[in-house]
């Protein structure tokens, strides 16, 4: 199966945000049983993983029928589409949020800050709790310089985030498989940045798939640092596919560990299904409903 990344799909499909694909005949929203029963964790799902399969309104209805309350990684116009289904966007994009061109380089700060200055009030208005940000690629930069630059950039915008009650979540990504040269590829680096910024509205987007590839030790890291984490992503390792018995992690145990920290944010599924997409998502939601 050809490898698909979030970046590839966002680029190739952004012109058709609402989608242009037909819902498979075997899937009907009215026939879905509510899956979320316990609800200790608020679960969401990343839209980019399903853009090849569904129109956004149809997918939103399916997600709502499952018992989820949000969809992840939407553009502002897409946030409006899902409102009628009682859903919010759990993680939004701000302008100039680019994986390689991140906060580690001061040359990017003006564009990033401008995008967040526009995006934060809009996020508050649309009830989007989080906006994504990135550390950026190294390009030869030392971690010490990058850390200082990231803190400087986030300090410019943290007050606005605090005033509007919107979280800026900077994502940890792996540099071993998917994002070569990415600077924020270790939890220690990201934690140093967030601790130095010292704002309740600047957190990590802790992508469990990426952290597992780079360092493992998922549960202990979460338990010791949960106060610095604003959002979680799931994805099976290896391959970023279903959360099943082909994967390295015991996802129910991981999710129980998250719930035990009294986490109030979202755990968003960000895996690319290889089988029936709704069946795969349903199984993941049930597994993580701890």
For every predicted segment, state its role.
Residues 8, 13-22, 35, 101-203, ...:
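Active-site acidic/histidine proton-transfer and metal-coordination neighborhood
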Residues 49-51, 75-77, 95-97, 137-139, ...:
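Active-site-proximal loop/turn and secondary-structure-junction residues that shape catalytic pockets
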Residues 59-78:
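Catalytic domains of carbohydrate-active enzymes, especially glycoside hydrolases
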Residues 75-85, 99-100:
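Glycine-rich, proline-tolerant flexible connector loops at the mouths of alpha/beta enzymes
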Residues 2-64, 127-129, 184-206, 210-290:
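Histidine-acidic metal/acid-base catalytic patches
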Residues 44-54, 100-111:
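Active-site mouth loops of central-metabolism enzymes
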């Amino acid at each position: 199966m050809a490898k698909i990344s979030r970046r590839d799909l966002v680029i190739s499909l952004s012109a058709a945000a609402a989608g242009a694909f037909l819902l498979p005949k075997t899937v009907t929203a009215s026939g879905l049983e509510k899956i979320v029963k316990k609800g200790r964790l608020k679960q969401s799902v990343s839209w980019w993983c399903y853009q090849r399969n569904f129109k956004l309104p149809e997918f939103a209805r399916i997600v709502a029928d499952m018992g989820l309350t949000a969809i992840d990684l939407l553009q502002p116009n897409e946030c409006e589409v899902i409102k009628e289904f009682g859903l919010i966007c759990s993680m939004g994009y701000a302008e100039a949020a680019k994986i390689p061109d991140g906060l580690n380089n001061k040359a990017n700060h003006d564009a990033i800050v401008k995008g967040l200055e526009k995006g934060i009030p809009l996020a508050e208005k649309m009830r989007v709790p989080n906006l994504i940000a990135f550390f950026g690629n190294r390009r030869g930069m030392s971690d010490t310089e990058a850390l200082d630059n990231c803190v400087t950039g986030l300090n410019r915008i943290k007050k606005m985030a605090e005033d509007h009650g919107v979280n800026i979540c900077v994502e940890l990504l792996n540099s071993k498989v998917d994002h070569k040269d990415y600077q924020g590829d270790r939890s220690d680096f990201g934690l140093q940045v967030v601790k130095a910024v010292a704002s309740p509205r600047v957190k990590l987007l802790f992508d469990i798939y990426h952290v597992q590839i780079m360092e493992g030790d998922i549960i202990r890291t979460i338990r010791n640092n949960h106060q610095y984490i604003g959002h979680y992503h799931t994805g099976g390792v290896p391959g970023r596919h279903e959360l099943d018995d082909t994967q390295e992690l015991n996802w129910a145990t991981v999710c129980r560990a998250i719930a035990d920290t009294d986490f109030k944010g979202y755990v968003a599924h960000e895996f690319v299904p290889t089988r029936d997409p709704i069946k795969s998502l349903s199984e993941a939601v049930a597994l993580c409903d701890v």
